[in-house]
C-alpha cells in the first residue's frame, strides 16, 4: 500500500482546518444577514437616547478600535479601546419594530463579558460557565462556537443558547436596534441573521 506524500497530508489538514471564508456562509431562507463578513457597514455608535452618533459603513474597524471586521467574524475586544468610555455598544443603524427571530453565533475567550442588546434591554453574552450568569448550562461549549436564538413576539423575547433557555420572557420596548457590548476581554460573533415575523 502506497503512503501519501507528506505535503499532500499537510495540504489536506490545512484545508480541513481553514476557517470558512465570508462568502461561504449564507443566511437561512427568510433571514437577512446583519453582518456582511467584510466590514462594519450597517453598524455604528449611538448615544443614551439611541440617536446615531457615528457609523462605520465601509470601515474595517470602529473609531476606538473596540470592534473590528475579520473575514466572516465580527470581533469585540475590550482591551483595544484607545479612547472613549470603558463600556461600548455597537448598534445596528436599522431598527426593528416588528416581531422577529434573531440568530447569532458567538465564541468567548475565558471569562469574556459581552452582551446582545435587544432594542434596549441586554441579554448577557459571556463565557457563561466562568463569568455567569447562566452557570448551570449543560450544552454551552467553552471557547467554541455557540448559538443564541432570540424570538421576539409582542415585545417579549424568548432567548436560548444551544437550545437551553436563558430568558423565557424578557420585556422589550416597541422598537429599537440590535447591539453588541464590549465590556471585558474578547468575544467573536458570526452568522448574525434576522427574520421578521408576522
Annotate each PLM feature.
Residues 20-198:
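Carbohydrate-interacting regions of secretory-pathway proteins
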Residues 7-15:
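Bacterial N-terminal signal peptides
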Amino acid at each position: 500500500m502506497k503512503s501519501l506524500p507528506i505535503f499532500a497530508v499537510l495540504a489536506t489538514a490545512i484545508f480541513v482546518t481553514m476557517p470558512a471564508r465570508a462568502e461561504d456562509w449564507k443566511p437561512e431562507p427568510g433571514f437577512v444577514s446583519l453582518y456582511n463578513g467584510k466590514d462594519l457597514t450597517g453598524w455604528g455608535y449611538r448615544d443614551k437616547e439611541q440617536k446615531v452618533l457615528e457609523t462605520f459603513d465601509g470601515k474595517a474597524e470602529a473609531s476606538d478600535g473596540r470592534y473590528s471586521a475579520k473575514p466572516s467574524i465580527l470581533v469585540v475586544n475590550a482591551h483595544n479601546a484607545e479612547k472613549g468610555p470603558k463600556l461600548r455598544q455597537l448598534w445596528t443603524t436599522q431598527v426593528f419594530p416588528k416581531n422577529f427571530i434573531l440568530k447569532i453565533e458567538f465564541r468567548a475567550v475565558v471569562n469574556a463579558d459581552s452582551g446582545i442588546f435587544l432594542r434596549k434591554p441586554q441579554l448577557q453574552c459571556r463565557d457563561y460557565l466562568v463569568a455567569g450568569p447562566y452557570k448551570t448550562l449543560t450544552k454551552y461549549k467553552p471557547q467554541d462556537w455557540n448559538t443564541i436564538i432570540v424570538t421576539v413576539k409582542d415585545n417579549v423575547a424568548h432567548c436560548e443558547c444551544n437550545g437551553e433557555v436563558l430568558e423565557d420572557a424578557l420585556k422589550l420596548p416597541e422598537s429599537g436596534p440590535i447591539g453588541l457590548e464590549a465590556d471585558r476581554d474578547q468575544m467573536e460573533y458570526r452568522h448574525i441573521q434576522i427574520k421578521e415575523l408576522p
